[in-house]
Each structure stands twice: as structure tokens, then as C-alpha cells.
């Protein structure tokens, strides 16, 4: 049957029904059907389709032209520093700079100090240094030497070259140690044979020995002159007459004798007096005094190896304090 005849046979509603039939067939051929809403069939005979089925995707269009470059972004944060690279080649020396301004005048050098500085503790005393203590003096060869000056005893001006006071320093030492000197400014010391020789070579010096026992008793011995020869003469003791002192004379017997240590035997005894009596001294055979002996703290049963002074205490008493000092006359 032709569609036109069929629509005419259905009367005034025929065209609408034909369209609905075709819509139904199309919806069955697809998975989904459009949502249809009939509006005004009785009045206006109109049909409104609110949503139809989606069509098949179209072919992709042509690629568009590249757009213009965007604006440059802001600078980012700095990254983590990398490892240091190898050192570059050394550059060439630059041009010489201009001469600088003249500096301030420096302090006087040693030669000037030697020419004008004090030579002895006696000279320091005459310059107004009245306090006992450590001072710098200058030897004849311009060497500076720090010494302990006793400005209190017997008029002052004494240079102390030996001090024993507490046993803190071992005096049983070698020839080299006595040559150079040893000990502490705060305690016990030996100034050194070379230094003692240099001090006594400046002129005539007197000698004083001060002793104190462990009961607090003080005694002394004083000699008219004192000189120590140089190492070539084995530091021989050249001693003047005993002048005074309540300690008595226990050093005259050692005059004109050589200095001996445990490793350098220059005495007149078949044995080594320094090794036997554990000291270092101008031994003959062997001694009347041994002020560089062992620190034995008063009475001792051992024989003659302490800080002994025969004329006071004999050979079995070791003194608490011993000081040997010289003064240029």
C-alpha cells in the first residue's frame, strides 16, 4: 500500500500516526529511543520532541595553527649549589701596587737594650727596682737572661743562681743539664754553669749562701769573692776568703776544684763522688758541703747524700731551703 493512500484512509490524524510509526521503528533499530512528549493533540495537533538520540561522532577536524608564544614566567628559586670544580690555572702576577705610607717607629731592638739595659741585679737596684723577683739582665755578649733578684737580703742586689725549697725538682742530673740550667721560676732551679760563668766574668762578685732547717732556723755563710771558670776549665770554683756567717765555712775546701756530675767525674777520689753522694758539686774527695744533693727533709740515716753543710748539721741533716747568690762588688 502506498503511504499516501494509507494516510488518507486514516483520516485527519493519519499523517501524525504515520510519523509515530516511523519513529517507533527507528527507536527499535537503535539501543535508545528519543524521549517524546505529545503536546496539544486534541487542540493544535502539534508534537514536541524534547531530546533525540545522539548521532555518531564526526570525523576529527584539521589541526589548528600554532598559537602565539605566551608571556615569560617569573625567575625560579636558585638550585642547590653544585660541587666545586677543579682549580683553574694560576693567574699572572698583577702590577706592582703603590708604595704604602711610612709605618710607626718600632720598639728598640736587642742591641739597643743591651747597650742601655742592666747587667746585674745590683744595677737594677741602683735604677730603682726595689722589689725582689724575676728580671731581665744582659750578659756581656748581649744575651738577655731572666734571673731572680733578691732585693731584700743584706742590702739587696743579689742574683740567685741556686734555690732548693720543696724537693719539686730533681738535682741529680747530667753534665749537660747543669751546663744549660734547669728548674722552675716558681720553685727550685739551677741557673746554668755557662750563665754563672758569664755573670762572674764581669768583675769581682761576692758569694752568699742562705740555709733554713725544718724548724725555721736561718743561717748563712758569706765569701769575699766567687768565680766559676768556663767549660774548658771544667767550671772550676775560684773562691775568696770566708768573711762571716753563723752557718760556718763548709765551702773553702772545695775551692780550686772542678765541677763533677754523675756522668762526668772530675774529682780526686777513686770513686765518682757525684754518683756516690747523688748530687753535682765541686767535689774533691769527697765533700764538706753538698747543696745539690737529695732533698731528704731533715735528719736522714743515709750518709752525706742530702742537702748537707758540714759545719751546721754535719752529714745527716738535709736542709729545707738552700739559696746560693752572687753580687757584683
Curated annotation (Swiss-Prot):
SUPFAM superfamilies with a match to the protein in the record: Fibrinogen C-terminal domain-like
Domain Fibrinogen C-terminal: 112-329
Cited SMART domains: FBG
Domain Collagen-like: 52-111
Alphabetized UniProt keyword annotations: Calcium, Collagen, Complement activation lectin pathway, Disulfide bond, Glycoprotein, Immunity, Innate immunity, Lectin, Metal-binding, Repeat, Secreted, Signal
Binding site for Ca(2+): 265, 267, 269, 271
Record region (Disordered): 64-113
Record-level GO BP terms: complement activation, lectin pathway
Broad class of where this protein is predominantly found: secreted
Molecular function as annotated in GO: antigen binding; carbohydrate binding; carbohydrate derivative binding; metal ion binding; signaling receptor binding
InterPro entries assigned to the protein according to its UniProt record, in alphabetical order: Collagen, Fibrinogen-like_C, Fibrinogen_a/b/g_C_1, Fibrinogen_a/b/g_C_dom, Fibrinogen_C-term_domain, Fibrinogen_CS
UniProt feature, compositional bias: Low complexity: 77-90
Subcellular location per the Swiss-Prot or TrEMBL entry: Secreted
GO CC annotation terms, alphabetical: collagen trimer; collagen-containing extracellular matrix; extracellular space
Signal peptide: 1-29
Record: glycosylation sites: 316
Cysteine-cysteine disulfides: 114-142, 121-149, 273-286
NCBIfam families: GGGWT_bact
Function: May function in innate immunity through activation of the lectin complement pathway. Calcium-dependent and GlcNAc-binding lectin.
Domain comment (free text): The fibrinogen-like domain (FBG) contains calcium-binding sites that may be involved in carbohydrate binding.
Record's subunit section: Homotrimer. Interacts with elastin. Interacts with MASP1 and MASP2.
Protein name in UniProt: Ficolin-2
Organism: Bos taurus (Bovine)
UniProt lineage: Eukaryota, Metazoa, Chordata, Craniata, Vertebrata
Amino acid at each position: 500500500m502506498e503511504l499516501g493512500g494509507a494516510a488518507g484512509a486514516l483520516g485527519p490524524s493519519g499523517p501524525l500516526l504515520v510519523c509515530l510509526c516511523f519513529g517507533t521503528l527507528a527507536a527499535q533499530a537503535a539501543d535508545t529511543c528519543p524521549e517524546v512528549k505529545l503536546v496539544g493533540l486534541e487542540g493544535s495537533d502539534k508534537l514536541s520532541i524534547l531530546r533525540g538520540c545522539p548521532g555518531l561522532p564526526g570525523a576529527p577536524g584539521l589541526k589548528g595553527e600554532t598559537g602565539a608564544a605566551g608571556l615569560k614566567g617569573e625567575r625560579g628559586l636558585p638550585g642547590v649549589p653544585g660541587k666545586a670544580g677543579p682549580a683553574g690555572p694560576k693567574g699572572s702576577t698583577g702590577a706592582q701596587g703603590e708604595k704604602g705610607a711610612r709605618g710607626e717607629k718600632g720598639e728598640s731592638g736587642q742591641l739597643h737594650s743591651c747597650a742601655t739595659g742592666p747587667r746585674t741585679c745590683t744595677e737594677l737596684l741602683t735604677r730603682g727596682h726595689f722589689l725582689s723577683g724575676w728580671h731581665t739582665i744582659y750578659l756581656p755578649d748581649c744575651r738577655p737572661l731572666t734571673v731572680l733578684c733578691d732585693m731584700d737580703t743584706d742590702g739587696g742586689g743579689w742574683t740567685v743562681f741556686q734555690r732548693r725549697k720543696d724537693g719539686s725538682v730533681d738535682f741529680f742530673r747530667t753534665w749537660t743539664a747543669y751546663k744549660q740550667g734547669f728548674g722552675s721560676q716558681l720553685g727550685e732551679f739551677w741557673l746554668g754553669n755557662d750563665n754563672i760563668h758569664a755573670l762572674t766574668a764581669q768583675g769581682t762578685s761576692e758569694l752568699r749562701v742562705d740555709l733554713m732547717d725544718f724548724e725555721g732556723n736561718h743561717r748563712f755563710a758569706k765569701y769575699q769573692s766567687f768565680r766559676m771558670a768556663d767549660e774548658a776549665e771544667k767550671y772550676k770554683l775560684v773562691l775568696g776568703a770566708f768573711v762571716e756567717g753563723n752557718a760556718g765555712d763548709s765551702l773553702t775546701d772545695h775551692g780550686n776544684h772542678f765541677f763533677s756530675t754523675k756522668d762526668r767525674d772530675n774529682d780526686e777520689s777513686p770513686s765518682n763522688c757525684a754518683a756516690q753522694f747523688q748530687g753535682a758539686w765541686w767535689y774533691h774527695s769527697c765533700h764538706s758541703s753538698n747543696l745539690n744533693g737529695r732533698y731528704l727533709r731533715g735528719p736522714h740515716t743515709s750518709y752525706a747524700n742530702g742537702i748537707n753543710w758540714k759545719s751546721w748539721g754535719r752529714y745527716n741533716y738535709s736542709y729545707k731551703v738552700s739559696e746560693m747568690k752572687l753580687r757584683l762588688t
